């Protein structure tokens, strides 16, 4: 099976193709069915760039480096020709898939990044954190072709190979969240696998089962309370067995500046993204450090 990549002629980006051989389980079945129906994009084949509108504002800070992508390590990490490792900021790409085929989505994401950027020049713009604990550069990476620049994070999110992460530049958060929503609605890429779907806060056991993982959780807020230096946004009314989103009170001002009144969330439906933690025996927690992690439900 081959999934076509490319862009509009106006952008001057040559088309390339990606071999997705060797995959098993739901991914193979989905691709086979989709190709038979002429709907390859349903399973997340990267969409043509002419279907992606340019970002209203550039993601990231100043340009700090350029280089050629020499090697892909995973769906969000690559090595430049000078040996530096770069980790794409603002996105999360699964390192393990669902129980049916754990390797499918991570393998597809890495192959997608290779097809988009392998051997090409990239421009790196600063992320809020310059590097991670492993010394890898954290950056917004723009691929350069024929003088035009395309944000890799934008392409991976829009084609369903990545989710918007918990730390994202506010200048382009709305755009990337919108692209994720469209990919989710169209069941592109990882969104074709129910394992990666938005978790229901009314089923706490499903959320708790993802402890240690990045996930999206949606539900109706039962209450908002304060204690000490923390604001607690509770999906349930019990002290145990439910889900809580925590926000440090020192961060409340940044949420308010983004138009998010935390204390007015009771009774509202929200979607929160972040890392699932376990507190006590049966309570799931998500720490929200930034307003972009919380969306008001449709």
Please tell me what each predicted stretch does.
Residues 17-33:
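Bacterial N-terminal signal peptides that target proteins for export
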Residues 3, 9-11, 29:
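Acidic, Ala/Val/Gly-enriched low-complexity intrinsically disordered segments
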Residues 6, 19, 43-298:
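Small beta-barrel nucleic-acid-binding modules, primarily SNase/OB-fold domains
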Residues 7-10, 20, 37:
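Generic detector of N-terminal low-structure segments
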Residues 30-42:
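Bacterial N-terminal signal peptides
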